[in-house]
Curated annotation (Swiss-Prot):
Protein name per its UniProtKB record: DNA-directed RNA polymerase subunit beta
The species this protein was found in: Prochlorococcus marinus (strain AS9601)
Gene: rpoB
GO molecular function: DNA binding; DNA-directed RNA polymerase activity; ribonucleoside binding
E.C. code: 2.7.7.6
Alphabetically ordered keywords of this record: DNA-directed RNA polymerase, Nucleotidyltransferase, Transcription, Transferase
Entry-linked NCBIfam families: PRK00405.1, rpoB
CDD domains xref list: RNA_pol_B_RPB2
Biased composition regions of type Polar residues, renumbered to the chain: 1077-1091
Enzyme class: transferase
GO cellular component term, pick one: DNA-directed RNA polymerase complex
Region (Disordered): 1072-1097
BP term (GO), one: DNA-templated transcription
Similarity comment: family membership: Belongs to the RNA polymerase beta chain family.
Matching PROSITE patterns: RNA_POL_BETA
Length: 1097
């Protein structure tokens, strides 16, 4: 193989642990965060001060969870541990101390994979990016075009304090966006004399106006200032000095009400160059005076003072699981505090114990609410391992305390220079969330303050020092350095070769000689996220298409026989490993036993380590999770080695699709507008066949008329339909079921009124009591079929927790194999997506000079305008690799090896491939990368040579089977009486405003009238129309739509006398066709039409 091939493989770097951000945060919560909250919360004293309850936070303990992870999933339980904490109740009068360990609630635990199991479902807590607490200076233009400056002091929790200037050079302050108050009034209220303030300022002359203004208003003393403050903050209440003092203290100086947090204190000290100790979390006089001083320096335009950019990553921080959970625990503890105080006051002082005071309910409720319904607690995307990994590394600006979609402007969503190496500039959703949801870059990590850091190698005198550990820098620190990108060319000793190097310095790009460079990036892929780093030749793709490529890889369905890409980037194995989908041995040793369900590794000391494999389990997205061993008995394994492949993995690497032979050429218009023409080989050889597992569930409930019963005895059902049911009436495992088949037989008792007339007649004649039950069985829905994989039965006797009112729950899992078909969506890794338009027999497909038919024909017009040329590089590199019988790893951004390196490498590979025996035809130097194909139908060659090669193509989760839908009659909405929408409701197709315009433009009046009445909400008309169709009569004239009547009624309810009149001025009664008993069924059926109507006139 040529030297370029070796270089291609050399640049692969190992990434840090990719789920670290989740695990480290939860570990911090257990070791520090929870203890911190319990300590802040204690002691609690009652209103008289006699009793004190202390929580000894560092002595909290967690009990072993009741169920392990797998058991919790099976039982629909939460994988959680009980929290106990030691409490001390001190009676101040008697000196008596009672100590007791008290249960304070259940805490869901994180699994090894960084997820939580809540009610049996795997969930992920997404990281949130919020504005960091601290002090921010910004400028605004007033209505006269004059620039004014303001300073905001933002705490972690508590009131915002804003200082601003006006055109008269007066300083004002606002508390929580209320009315503005003269800044000196606040200074006096805080007990500072004029001299105290003036001494601290570098330019007191600017501040003199504010002092004079306060004196003019007659506010000369602390008491008057407190009164004024109270008047402004609590208008309408009688002001008092003590009230003012209490208000000021509670707003800014009470640690329970005001908290800057560790980060806020760190940021304020850094910005204002203070040395206030780290544990002072409230505002100090020094903070306020320094803020005013800095603001005056900005006004006077004196060096050293700078404005803040709120979108800079130095001013935004990440809140991960631990911190979000800590905030929730604080909410729960505050609710608990009120309860404890009440109980202390009400209870008998002598007999009270800590356990009687502490009620775990508020804390449990707060934690449950967080995991169950917070915007940041999300149902994990388990479509494939990459989707799972990306979900755990997602960073959202939405959620409580963050932004809302509507309010977020362009600036927040935009890529900021400080994102470099921290947040991926490419991977973000399309649509309303663009830029608000980001992904962490590959090498980024979150530091103790919540700021994102990225690693660099140090550069000394033009030499890159790769010894030891890299240096991690946050965005603030990096701004002060000159940083070169990761693809800078160096010689073998690490000296930078070029004379001028492009560097980033203070968010600008400039070129400097090598000796001025401070740091070099670790790797070329450190700028982008994990999903984006799996795209080969990424640097040749337009960013919009790379974004689609990143997002679509997460939607690839795991296939039956996955195949790793011929052309990869070298990160595939790390993604598979860190996603948690592949079992990994933690010891060195030998494999002593292997079967489909478990692998046993014997370590060097003779101890056995068991690894149980997942077999055909259903994921959150109904795809199939299955693990297959890749080691044999007797194999030597080392710690960290992969033992088995998970779904969408092969050989320990992620394998989302198949390598297929692709030709870029038009074919009879079947690949017009991104459509895809595929060969029948894809279907027959199961290349794109995937397994999907559906879950069906039924409850037997206690009803007013008696219990529902799960049974085989179902009324009016043939014996044939019950063939596959066991004696309990539950389907047997392994049975093949189609739509409408019974999965679980269930009968419900029915009341007298439910009986049809013939049954009443029978009972009247014979006194015969037919079984008073109704068939309510669980059946396979329309369009579904498959094989029963598993049946689970839950009853109270077995100790299962059932929903209230249920006696028994049965769950049936049905697996189906879905082959690829017309209408399925496929995509490459470069954002080149399309829908299958036709499946052609392989003998009709265009074929290569050696007779091989191609697998897929794509439209060449999909490449130039979209500028994702990476797909062509991948195609040709794959073609060369397939002919050389090897796989290639190409790290993106390869210009460090020379200009146009991708081009040269691909060409060298193709030349190498054509030198193999019998492969001369593979590469034609006259027309590089193209071959003359022949038409499979005629055997004639096509006019022009065609680009052919191997590319990695994915089948996406948007399958036509899940989307195709039709309706004849079905359910109607109760109010508007229009058909419902959507496949799940068996709904109709919406005919919207624009479609009505189109029909109006054509003048298709009758079609339009029919669509708006009979086919929609003319209740009487549609029943008559159905009747007419059944009897073969002409369809009668449509009536009035129900929604028009609803509109009339709504206008009348506003008190408007509104009616409908004919041309002659006669009022039309819209309600005349309504039966007084209103017994028109919501779903017209043949029975409801009444037998009399069928008789011929």
């Amino acid at each position: 193989m040529s030297s370029s091939a070796l270089q291609v493989a050399k640049t692969a770097t190992y990434l840090p642990d990719l789920v670290e951000v989740q695990r480290a945060s939860f570990k911090w919560f257990l070791e520090k965060g929870l203890i911190e909250e319990l300590q802040n919360f204690s002691p609690i004293s009652d209103y008289t001060g006699k009793l004190e309850l202390h929580f000894i936070g560092e002595e909290y303990r967690l009990k072993r969870p009741r169920h392990d992870v797998e058991e919790a999933k099976r039982r629909d339980a939460t994988f959680a541990s009980q929290m106990y904490v030691t409490c001390r109740l001190i009676n101040k009068e008697t000196g008596e101390i009672k100590e007791q360990e008290v249960f304070i609630g259940e805490l869901p635990l994180m699994t090894e994979r960084g997820t939580f199991i809540i009610n049996g479902a795997e969930r992920v807590i997404v990281n949130q990016i919020v504005r960091s607490p601290g002090v921010y200076f910004k400028d605004e233009l007033d209505k006269n075009g004059r620039r004014t400056y303001n300073a905001n002091v933002i705490p972690n929790r508590g009131a915002w304090l804003k200082f601003e200037t006006d055109k008269n050079n007066l300083l004002y302050v606002r508390v929580d966006k209320t009315r503005k108050i003269n800044a000196h009034v606040l200074m006096r209220a805080m007990g500072l004399s004029d001299n105290d303030v003036v001494d601290k300022l570098r330019h007191p002359e600017f501040y003199q106006n504010s002092i004079d203004s306060a004196n003019d208003e007659g506010i000369n003393s602390e008491d008057q200032a407190l009164l004024e403050l109270y008047k402004k903050l609590r208008p309408g209440e009688p002001p008092s000095v003590s009230g003012g003092q209490q208000l000021l203290n509670s707003r800014f100086f009470d640690p329970k009400r005001y908290d800057l947090g560790r980060v806020g204190r760190y940021k304020i000290n850094k910005k204002l160059r203070l040395t206030v100790p780290d544990d002072v979390r409230t505002l100090t006089h020094e903070d306020v005076l320094s803020t005013i001083d800095y603001l005056i320096n900005l006004e006077l335009d004196i060096g050293g003072a700078s404005l803040d950019d709120i979108d800079h990553l130095g001013n935004r921080r990440v809140r991960s699981v631990g911190e979000l959970l800590q905030n929730q625990v604080r909410v729960g503890l505050n609710r608990l505090e009120r309860i404890i105080k009440e109980r202390m006051t009400v209870g008998e002082t002598d007999s009270l114990t800590p356990a009687q005071l502490v009620n775990p309910k508020p804390l449990v409720a707060a934690i449950k609410e967080f995991f169950g319904s917070s915007q940041l607690s999300q149902f994990m995307d388990q479509t494939n391992p990459l989707a799972e990994l990306t979900h755990k590394r997602r960073i959202s600006a939405l959620g409580p305390g963050g932004l809302t979609r509507e309010r977020a402007g362009f600036a927040v969503r935009d890529i900021h220079p400080s994102h470099y190496g921290r947040l991926c500039p490419i991977e973000t959703p399309e649509g309303p969330n663009a830029g608000l949801i980001n992904s962490l870059a590959t090498h980024a990590r979150v530091n103790e303050y919540g700021f994102i850091e990225t690693p660099f190698w140090e550069v000394k005198n033009g030499k890159v020092n790769k010894e030891g550990n890299p240096v991690y820098l946050s965005a603030d620190l990096e701004d002060e350095c000159r940083v070169a990108p990761g693809d800078v060319a160096t010689d073998k000793d690490g000296n930078i070769i070029a004379d001028l190097i492009p560097v980033r310095y203070r968010q600008d790009f400039e070129k400097v000689p090598p000796h001025q460079v401070d740091y070099v990036q670790l790797s070329p892929v450190q700028v982008i996220s994990v999903a984006t780093s799996l795209i080969p030749f990424l640097e040749h793709d337009d960013a919009n298409r790379a974004l689609m490529g990143s997002n679509m890889q997460r939607q690839a369905v795991p296939l039956l026989r996955p195949e790793r890409p011929l052309v990869g980037t070298g990160l595939e194995s790390q993604v598979a490993r860190d996603s948690g989908m592949v079992p990994i041995t933690k010891v060195n040793g030998t494999v002593s036993y292997v079967d489909a369900n478990e692998i046993v590794v014997k370590d060097d000391h003779g101890n056995e380590h068991f690894h149980y494999l997942q077999k055909y389990q259903r994921s959150n997205q109904d795809t199939c999770l299955n693990q297959r061993p890749i080691v044999k008995i007797g194999d030597k394994v080392i710690s960290g080695q992969v033992l088995a492949d998970g779904s969408a993995c092969e050989g320990g690497e992620i394998a989302l699709g198949q390598n297929v032979l692709i030709a870029y050429m038009p074919w009879e218009g079947y690949n017009y507008e991104d459509a895809i023409l595929v060969s029948e080989r894809m279907v027959t050889d199961d290349l794109y066949t995937s397994v999907h597992i559906e879950k069906y569930e039924i409850e037997a409930r206690q009803t007013k008329l008696g219990p529902e019963e799960i049974t085989r005895e179902i009324p009016n059902i043939s014996e044939e339909s019950l063939n596959n049911l066991d004696e309990m009436g539950i389907i047997r495992i392994g049975a093949f079921v189609e739509s409408g088949d019974i999965l679980v037989g269930k009968v419900t008792p029915k009341g007298e009124s439910d009986q049809p007339p013939e049954e009443k007649l029978l009972r009247a004649i014979f006194g015969e009591k037919a079984r008073d039950v109704r068939d309510n069985s669980l059946r396979v829905p329309k369009t579904e079929k498959g094989r029963v994989l598993d049946v689970r039965i839950y009853t109270r006797e077995q100790g299962d927790e059932l929903p209230p009112g249920a006696n028994m729950v049965v769950r049936v899992y049905v697996a189906q194999r879905r082959k690829i078909q017309v209408g399925d969506k496929m995509a490459g890794r470069h954002g080149n997506k399309g829908i299958i338009s036709r499946i052609l027999p392989r003998e009709d497909m265009p074929y290569l000079p050696d007779g091989t038919p191609v697998d897929i024909v794509l439209n060449p017009l999909g490449v130039p305008s979209r500028m994702n040329v990476g797909q062509v590089f991948e195609l040709l590199m794959g073609w060369a690799a397939a002919n050389l019988n090897c796989r290639v790893k190409v790290v993106p951004f390869d210009e460090m090896y020379g200009a146009e390196k991708s081009h040269q490498t691909v060409q060298a590979f193709l030349e190498e491939a054509s030198k193999q025996p019998g492969k001369a035809w593979v590469y034609n130097p006259e027309d590089p990368g193209k071959l003359l194909l022949k038409d499979g139908r005629t055997g004639e060659p096509f006019d022009q040579p065609v680009a052919v090669g191997y590319s990695h193509f994915l089948k996406l989760v948007h399958l036509v089977d899940d989307k195709i839908h039709a309706r004849s009659t079905g359910p109607y909405s109760l109010v508007t009486q229009q058909p419902l929408g959507g496949k799940a409701q068996q709904g109709g197709q919406r005919l919207g405003e624009m479609e009505v315009w189109a029909l109006e433009a054509y003048g298709a009046a009758y079609t339009l009238q029919e669509l708006l009445t009979v086919k929609s909400d003319d209740m009487q008309g549609r029943n008559e129309a159905l009747n007419a169709i059944v009897k073969g009569k002409p369809i009668p004239r449509p009536g009035t739509p129900e929604s028009f009547k609803v509109l009339m009624r709504e206008l009348q309810s506003l008190g408007l006398d509104i009616g409908v009149y004919t041309d002659e001025g006669k009022e039309v009664d819209l309600m005349q066709d309504i039966n007084p008993r209103r017994n028109t069924p919501s779903r017209p059926t043949y029975e409801s039409l009444g037998t009399s109507e069928y008789e011929e006139d």
